[in-house]
Design a protein with these regions (language model features):
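His/Asp/Glu-rich, glycine-adjacent segments
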Residues: 1-167
Length: 168
């Protein structure tokens, strides 16, 4: 309906391949049926287009989360070779093996029944307040115009928090 080309390249290792670039599959780092990943090689497709594909997936599934993610310096072929079957049969991209985290990593978490326009950060930003999203929060919460400080290193995240608190 949305005009995407969707195939299942390997019925023995079933996942969806969208427009020969984007993989839609289970998240193999969580319990069965909880999260779908929409993974992409960002040198071949803009993140905004991957996000549109992710939003299409989000509208059509009832899992808790759809995670849209991608990285640069990743080929479509390498991404496809990163698809694995877990011991319990779950099939998905092994994200660390896919190299999406290494360069130009972008991610957006799309929760079930959650609209960013009704979340506190967006409401605060619309009322003229400064909003800063630090660490993993900048991945999980979407707020247009927010200051973003990505990071997983605890020391850097704490420095960013203290810096932002000093500027409030």
């Amino acid at each position: 309906k949305e005009g995407y080309k969707v195939t299942i390249p390997n019925p023995e290792l079933p996942y969806l391949l969208v427009n020969d670039l984007v993989i839609v599959a289970d998240n193999i780092e969580t319990d069965y049926g909880q999260i779908y990943n929409v993974s992409a090689p960002l040198d071949y497709i803009p993140f905004e287009e991957v996000l549109k594909i992710g939003q299409c997936v989000r509208k059509n599934v009832r899992v808790n989360r759809v995670i849209v993610l991608g990285g640069e310096n990743v080929t479509p072929e390498h991404l496809q070779r990163s698809v694995e079957r877990r011991e319990d049969g779950l099939v998905g991209v092994n994200s660390p093996k896919s190299n999406v985290y290494k360069q130009g990593y972008q991610v957006r978490h799309l929760g079930f029944g959650i609209s960013p326009e009704f979340q506190l950060p967006t409401l605060a930003k619309k009322s003229g307040m400064e909003v800063s999203l630090i660490g993993k929060m900048q991945d999980v919460i979407y707020c247009e115009g927010a200051n973003r400080f990505p990071g997983v290193d605890t020391e850097q995240v704490m420095k960013d928090i203290l810096h932002e608190m000093d500027n409030v």
